[in-house]
Amino acid sequence: MDKIHAMQLFIKVAELESFSRAADFFALPKGSVSRQIQALEHQLGTQLLQRTTRRVKLTPEGMTYYQRAKDVLSNLSELDGLFQQDATSISGKLRIDIPPGIAKSLLLPRLSEFLYLHPGIELELSSHDRPVDILHDGFDCVIRTGALPEDGVIARPLGKLTMVNCASPHYLTRFGYPQSPDDLTSHAIVRYTPHLGVHPLGFEVASVNGVQWFKSGGMLTVNSSENYLTAGLAGLGIIQIPRIAVREALRAGRLIEVLPGYRAEPLSLSLVYPQRRELSRRVNLFMQWLAGVMKEYLD
């Protein structure tokens, strides 16, 4: 059995949760992939995958082996370029996840700089409002807002995002400018929640005494940050959003800031990555570059 090839097959089966899809990826018969994984499990003396009729899931032992196997293959890739000091010679794949608003307004406009410096690196970019499972889904690093991450990962604080309250000119012409949070009962607030069915607390205001919540009007709740911004631009209500996500709209006059003295608490931003023994050089390079780019826009 080719141990390295078996590890590659195992990793792909784990990530795709399917023997068939992994076999298609490698252009191999499904039976061949299954036999090699079984041989790997027999050699290790433990079950790595839990097989059902619909999907394949990692066992606890499989999760541990998955992470170590990823490290081994990453280190082998690094070893190929060990004596090549030129950063342009570094190659390999990076899988990252960044919130949609940050990816659209900050990362993607600057990403060509990194790819130009490191043409051998292939990037897989994921953007979700809901947190991804860093370990299970095989991410090298992610940008997280708010709450601290789960076990098995390391969080590197990057800074805070300033929040602003804003609405479209059309909305303000129709409903007027609120002068204080107490006025919001007669205004429409677009509400955001990652999970529909969970009623948001209301309009958030940070103060020296902590966060305060004010009652407000409004009939729209969304679970997508992209739709949240679009709703604000469409005049459906006031939104509370990171300034970086609306800076162009504010400059162009498509949104206008309201209640500047009553902003929500700044949003903490962290760079999160798996707790491995040693990060690959390409992961380190990307995280250093990303932290430098983010620094320009954080408080």
Swiss-Prot record:
Alphabetized GO MF terms: DNA-binding transcription factor activity; sequence-specific DNA binding
Ranges for domain HTH lysR-type: 1-59
Gene3D superfamilies for the chain: 3.40.190.290, Winged helix-like DNA-binding domain superfamily/Winged helix DNA-binding domain
InterPro entries cross-referenced by the UniProt entry: LysR_subst-bd, Tscrpt_reg_HTH_LysR, WH-like_DNA-bd_sf, WH_DNA-bd_sf
Pfam families the UniProt entry points to: HTH_1, LysR_substrate
Family matches, as PROSITE patterns: HTH_LYSR (PS50931)
GO biological process: DNA-templated transcription
This protein's record includes keyword Transport: no
Keywords: DNA-binding, Transcription, Transcription regulation
Keyword rRNA-binding: no
Residues in the DNA-binding region annotation: 19-38
Top-level taxonomic group: Bacteria
Family classification: Belongs to the LysR transcriptional regulatory family.
Name of this chain's protein: Uncharacterized HTH-type transcriptional regulator YhjC
Species of origin: Escherichia coli (strain K12)
